[in-house]
A protein has these predicted regions:
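N-terminal signal-anchor module of multipass membrane proteins
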Residues: 2-44, 52-56, 64-68
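Membrane-interfacial loop-to-helix junctions in multi-pass inner-membrane proteins
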Residues: 45-63, 89-95, 99, 119-137, ...
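Internal alpha-helical transmembrane segments
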Residues: 113-122, 127-133, 144-153, 177-255, ...
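Aromatic-rich transmembrane-lumenal/periplasmic boundary elements in polytopic membrane proteins
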Residues: 149, 231-334, 338
Length: 542
């Protein structure tokens, strides 16, 4: 039997595994393009330091990639175990991009990862660079297809409900592929991943510079990360704004929740910078507002209003009543004897209200027999169409605030790199090191807003979350949740241990004999050339 507790614990399990997985994904997306840049410099200049940079940062990339794949594979099985009705209902549509991702993108990136690590002595410089570029394309193609699937959940286009099969069926693959929400989500997410990768390299390079070790290696890494990070965070912010506009078109409820906008304001709407939200009374006790900004972000105009939560609830209530009729008509169509011709009048009536079927299914949470749903139940279902406002409001602002802090960091880092004086600014290096967790936190906040703000839907406007779960015992879900948390925590600890281990060793982990910590080689070189160990290190790196 489906219960509220079963739905909540199933949601929690998927949320936990997804958030764990997304600790690894953005670093993979970002670091792979930094490897392309570094190896391109090696091919163009022939300087060994660029090859060493590619190999060292590639070692950290490889650790992260392996654990990211491990956490990602197990997520897919949850669709069959915990979300069986979801899989049956939308599998024809949702499964297509995931299948393409596995057959095309994942195999490409996995093959190229192997060639990247084991091909240094077997491939020419140009061939190995091509492998690295294909590896980068593979990781980004993988993200593209997964985000096309997720974008369809947010804005389900190119598919229709078939009452004869009781499932969604794809009608226009191009519409699914070029779904504006999916495309905006893709470019915004990968840009955020690039920012994560740049921050990672910037922070570790800053640590080397603070320790005054591997200086020439760290200087180059810092400069590459500063330039790449500045472009990435600018792209993330601009594309995040575009994603906000897309939300305003397809998910007005989410937009209103993000802004704690209870009433429809005259256009152009103001942006609530901060607010004291009173969820119980459905109002803001006070708010600090910036005039016009929300209207420009949400509508790209000064004369189009943004609907407030109260008006959205009025619209949703009408759709629930329409959906109730759709559910009853669907029951009539399903009750027809097998092989008989459906009543054309019933079919025509159903087609008129089919678009609101999902809203009618919301009532099943409160009344298994939708025909017996009372006005009080309809009101409950209407209230449930609005996600909790407080976590949405503050998570979005945390994401944006961290984004602008990163913009400030990369702007100053890039300017100092151009001037060549960032080594003389220990405050900047310490700041870069302290900001290491920031892009991960921003990315996790962003995913929380995207997924939590879609509630109460798995497929927005079509399939309620309550209606999507498997009919399994709560004890089974608790057991698998505990297993996943334990397993993923161990993987995270392994990742952190290996990352810290090799980051502390630095490029000396390559065993080239040229870097800090390889004392035998430095003493030998310095004595033979009559140089200090530090001078010998710099000369060999360059």
């Amino acid at each position: 039997m489906i219960t509220e507790h079963l739905v909540d614990i199933s949601r929690l399990q998927f949320a936990v595994t997804a958030l764990y997985h997304f600790l690894f994904v953005p670093l993979t997306l970002g670091m792979v393009w930094l490897l392309v840049i570094m190896e391109s410099m090696y091919v163009m200049t022939g300087k060994e330091v660029w090859k060493d940079m590619t190999r060292f940062w590639g070692k950290l990339f490889g650790i992260n990639f392996a654990l990211g794949v491990t956490t990602g594979i197990t997520m897919e099985f949850q669709f069959g175990t915990n979300w069986a009705y979801y899989s049956q209902y939308v599998g024809d549509v949702f499964g297509a991009p995931l299948a393409i991702e596995g057959l095309m993108a994942f195999f490409l990136e996995s093959t190229m990862v192997g060639l990247f690590f084991f091909g240094w002595d077997r491939l020419s410089r140009g061939q190995h660079l091509l492998v690295t570029i294909l590896m980068a394309l593979g990781t980004n193609l993988s993200a593209l297809w997964i985000l096309i699937a997720n974008g369809w959940m947010q804005n389900p286009v190119g598919a229709e409900f078939n009452y004869q099969t009781m499932r969604m069926e794809m009608t226009d693959f191009a519409a699914v592929l070029f779904n504006p929400d999916a495309q905006n989500k893709f470019v915004h997410t990968v840009s955020a991943g690039y920012t994560v990768g740049a921050t990672f390299v910037l922070a570790i390079s800053a640590w080397y510079l603070l320790k005054k070790r591997d200086v020439e290696f760290a200087k180059r890494s810092f400069q590459v990360a500063a330039a790449f990070g500045f472009a990435s965070i600018c792209s993330t912010i601009v594309l995040g704004d575009e994603s906000g506009y897309s939300i305003g078109l397809a998910q007005q409820t989410k937009m209103a929740a993000i802004e704690a906008m209870w009433e429809t304001e005259p256009a152009p709407a103001s942006f609530n910078l901060i607010a004291d939200i009173n969820q119980a009374e459905q109002k803001n006790n006070w708010a600090v507002q910036i005039p016009y900004v929300m209207g420009l972000i949400g509508t790209r105009s000064l004369d189009t209003p943004i609907l407030g939560i109260h008006d959205i609830k009025i619209i949703n209530e009408k759709r629930i009543i329409n959906g109730q009729k759709a559910v009853l008509l669907l029951d009539q169509l399903r009750s027809a004897p097998p092989g008989s011709t459906p009543n054309p009048v019933t079919v025509a009536e159903f087609e008129k209200v089919k678009k609101d079927l999902g809203f009618g299914l919301l009532l099943k949470r409160y009344s298994p027999d939708v025909s017996k749903a009372t006005p009080a139940m309809i009101k409950q279902a209407t209230d449930a169409t609005i996600p909790p406002i407080v976590p949405m409001f503050w998570s979005f602002r945390a994401m944006v605030g961290l984004g602008f802090l990163l913009l400030a960091l990369f702007t100053i880092s890039l300017w100092s790199s151009v001037k060549g004086n960032f080594i003389e600014k220990p405050w900047l290096l310490r700041w870069a090191l302290l900001m290491l967790p920031a892009p991960w936190l921003a990315a996790e906040f962003g995913w929380f807003v995207a997924e939590y703000g879609r509630q109460p839907w798995t497929i927005y406007g079509m399939l309620p979350t309550y209606f999507s779960t498997s009919n399994i015992s709560v004890a089974n879900v608790y057991a698998s949740l505990a297993g996943f948390v334990g397993f993923y925590t161990v993987l995270l600890m392994i990742e952190m241990y290996l990352m810290v281990k090799y980051a502390r060793k630095g490029p000396a982990s390559l065993g080239t004999g040229k870097y800090y910590g390889e004392d035998t080689h430095k003493v030998h070189v310095s004595s033979s050339l009559n140089l200090s160990p530090k001078t010998a290190e710099v000369n060999h790196v360059v």
